Amino acid sequence: MLEVASARDRDWAGALVRDNMAEAYRRHGLAWDPARFAADWAGGENYLLRCDGGAVGYLRLLRHAGRSYLQDLQVVAERRGLGLGTQALEQAKALVRGRGEAALRLKVFADSPAVRLYRRHGFVELLNEPPLIGMECRLP
């Protein structure tokens, strides 16, 4: 279940994103930028994914120009493959739909395994900006 993250959760969430994205960043010649994460945290809607009483993931939504973007969806390594990412994604879509918005957008590395998850949940490719692709899910 998603719950609103507090300021004290920022370091944990940042470490999760940094660790989960390390291989993709290395592959694409990028470096982790803690200042960028802090700025994104400050400008976004931050949620922890909780299961069995503990934090097992992190999700951030960003509103820009009247649209909502899924900026981060991370699950701790030992809890992947259990449907937690799906659960968080569906809750994020419900949050955005509840605001009366018609779509949720995101950008993801084109070679990320997450692309399959997003496609299974109705996201389609809108643009190709290597190494990223932009995707959108229309919300009924």
Which stretches of residues belong to each language-model region?
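A short helix-loop-beta-strand connector motif used in the catalytic cores of GNAT acetyltransferases and
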Residues: A38-L48, A55, Y69
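Conserved beta-strand in the GNAT
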Residues: G54-L62, R67-Q74
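Conserved GNAT-fold acetyl-CoA-binding loop/helix
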Residues: R8, G14-W41
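Conserved beta-strand-loop-alpha-helix junction that forms the acyl-donor binding cleft
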Residues: A77-R80, R105-V115, P131-R138
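Short hydrophobic/aromatic beta-strand element in the GNAT-like acyltransferase core
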Residues: E45-L48, Y58, D72, R105, ...
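Conserved acetyl-CoA-binding loop of GNAT-fold acetyltransferases
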Residues: R119-E129
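Conserved acetyl-CoA-binding loop-helix of GNAT-fold acetyltransferases
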Residues: V75, G81-A94, R116-R120
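Conserved N-terminal entry element of GNAT/NAT acetyltransferase domains
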Residues: M1-R8, R138-P140
